[in-house]
Structure formats: C-alpha cells, structure tokens
C-alpha cells in the first residue's frame, strides 16, 4: 500500500480483496493508535507515522533475509558478503578496496552488484544486498551511513575541444556559458547525474537547458565520446584521473564551479547487523 498508495493495486499484488487490505490497515492503525494514511482530495498520502512504519518494515525484511542466510551458513568457515557499488565507485574505487579486503579476509566470499544509486537502495530494502557504496543522495531517515571519501566533481572536455565561450579564462567562464554545448550525462537514477541536477538547480538551471543532451549509462563510453569531441560532461575526478594525467581529457575552468561530494557506505537504518557492517567498512576503508 505504501508503494502504490492505492488499495486496489495493493490488493491485486497481494492476490486478496480490497476490503481485506483496508481491514488490515485499520487493524494496524488501531494497534499503533495513529493514522497511517490520509486522503488529500483524490490522493492517498502516507503520514509521518506511516513512513516510520514503512521504514521499520523494510529494515525488518532486510534483516530477515540476512539472518536467514547467516543461519544457513552456521558452522561454515566461509564468510559471505553481498555488497553493491555505484558505477563510478565500482569501476574506479572498488577494485583496489576489494583487493585489500580479500587479502585480509581470505575466507570471505564476496558478491558485488554494480548499479545506480536508486537500484542499489532498492536491493538493500529487499534484503538482496547487505550494504552499498554510493555517491548519490539517499534518505538519512531510512539508512545509516558513514563517509568513505570526499571526491572532486568536475566539468570536462576533450583535449582539443573548444567551448563556444572559450576554455582558458576561468575568471570569465561560468556554468551558464556552457549551455550552448552538447552534454553527455548518465541515466536517470544515477547518483552522478543527480549531483549535477542539484548543482544546476541551485543556479536556476537544468540539464534540459543545454543545447543537446546525450544520456549514456556507461562511463567508459561517455569518456570516449568526450575525448572524441562530441560534447562536455561532469564526472568525478576519480573517474577521469588517468585521462587527465595523459592529457586526453581536461578540466573546464569555471568561475562558479568548485564542487566536492562524498562517497557513502550505507545500510538499512536500525539493522541488527549495523555493528558488523561498520566493522566490515572499517576493513574496506583501511589502506594499510
């Protein structure tokens, strides 16, 4: 019901009648002594109490899956981790991190899913992932977290690319001066994209304000197209460090763009496995 905000759709998913769904909600409201949903016109809206109950339910579901797997492995020497990472982290940060962890914990069996932030959070909610490393935004009310690192987020172009506003005078060029360029951007749901959208929103701009928009869900393809002069992009410095060092990609100097963003280690808020996840994170982060 929380997901659909509609009794009929919830009943169809659960294969029960709509009155049965309504009755279950009434029983819950009576038990907790508060409204879980209210009507605003023709819309059903989740109350704050309803949101808290939904969050607690998702945490319980996550812990149930994790506990079931843990129980199945009682007596086994092998440790099994199900972790996720966003594409930037998965391709440019995670490999060395995992290598260090595997050397320290050779008994561990690691299962890694690389996807965008919204998909990873959904997999955590479903109990299919223990935790994830993400750069996108997430609800602090629903997830516990620790900061892994703080990374520069920069505008980039190919080595020989010239913007319509020029590229050499950082005292003059502003973000809005790039709107005449083609923009290569990640797909919706990507943390890398959401960071840019929020930055632009703070400047009363949008990705749709650029002359042309190319949506690409692969960072390597984006970097290749940038190198070939097909437009500009905004990526984490960690994702283009090699190309910057080689000179095939360069940072666009902007007067009004000096952005850093955190990479986060996240798990369900209130999880009974929170202490264990923190210990694993400590091992993953340790570079010695």
Regions found by a protein language model. Name each.
Residues 1-17:
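Short helix-boundary/capping micro-motifs
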Residues 9, 29-46:
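A short LG(V/I)-centered, amphipathic sequence patch enriched
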Residues 31-32, 53-75, 280:
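Alpha-helical linker/hinge and terminal dimerization helices associated
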Residues 78-141:
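Central regulatory/effector-binding core of bacterial HTH transcription factors
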Residues 116-117, 125-128, 205-251:
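Hydrophobic hinge/microswitch elements
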Residues 143-188:
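Flexible hinge/capping segments at coil-to-helix
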Residues 182-204, 273-275, 281:
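Secondary-structure junction motif
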Residues 221, 250-288:
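A late-sequence structural motif
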